[in-house]
Amino acid sequence: MKAQDLREKNVEELNEELLNLLREQFNLRMQAATGQLQQTHTLKAVRRDIARVKTLLNEKAGA
């Protein structure tokens, strides 16, 4: 997910995206814990996407 795409969204859409990413992260962590996760790099990518969304939410809250 690109930061430019996220910047075009409003706060409500970003909150929805954050919720979806947190759910996805939870599911990936459960798969990793049970040994079902084949592509472990997806955990890192989702974690960074969450950070991007949170950063943009903080920027929009300050503006």
From Swiss-Prot:
GO cellular component: cytosolic large ribosomal subunit
Gene Ontology terms for molecular function: structural constituent of ribosome
Pfam family, one: Ribosomal_L29
Keyword tags: Ribonucleoprotein, Ribosomal protein
Gene Ontology biological process terms in this record: translation
Keyword Protein biosynthesis: no
Assigned protein family: Belongs to the universal ribosomal protein uL29 family.
Alphabetized HAMAP family for the sequence: Ribosomal_uL29 (MF_00374)
Protein name: Large ribosomal subunit protein uL29
Organism: Aliivibrio fischeri (strain ATCC 700601 / ES114)
